[in-house]
């Protein structure tokens, strides 16, 4: 069974928002090695983890309301 395009779009949008918010809210000064866009690994992992949790809850909620398939 293929995943619907709407599910993929929700995951991409929510994860992008979480990474942007995590860049400014998570401040880990112990690890100073920065990757792309001046965000370190701890900030990236925390943001992506939260993004996946919020995305999963959003998709399940929208599917239970029959707004997406």
Swiss-Prot record:
PROSITE patterns: PHOTOSYSTEM_I_PSAGK
BP GO terms, sorted: photosynthesis
Topology in membrane: Multi-pass membrane protein
Cellular compartment(s): Plastid, Chloroplast thylakoid membrane
Gene3D superfamilies referenced in this protein's UniProt entry, alphabetically: Photosystem I PsaK, reaction centre
Pfam families according to UniProt: PSI_PSAK
Annotated transmembrane regions: 1-21, 42-62
Keywords, ordered alphabetically: Chloroplast, Membrane, Photosynthesis, Photosystem I, Plastid, Thylakoid, Transmembrane, Transmembrane helix
GO CC annotation terms, alphabetical: chloroplast thylakoid membrane; photosystem I
Cell membrane recorded as keyword: no
Protein family per UniProt: Belongs to the PsaG/PsaK family.
Additional detail: Although originally identified as Cyanidium caldarium, these sequences derive from Galdieria sulphuraria.
Protein name: Photosystem I reaction center subunit PsaK
Species the sequence originates in: Galdieria sulphuraria
């Amino acid at each position: 069974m293929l995943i619907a395009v709407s599910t993929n779009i929700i995951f991409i949008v929510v994860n992008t928002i979480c990474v942007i918010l995590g860049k400014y809210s998570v401040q880990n000064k112990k690890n100073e090695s920065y990757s792309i866009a001046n965000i370190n690994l701890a900030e990236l992992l925390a943001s992506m983890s939260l993004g996946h949790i919020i995305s999963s809850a959003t998709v399940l909620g929208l599917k239970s309301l029959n707004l997406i398939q």
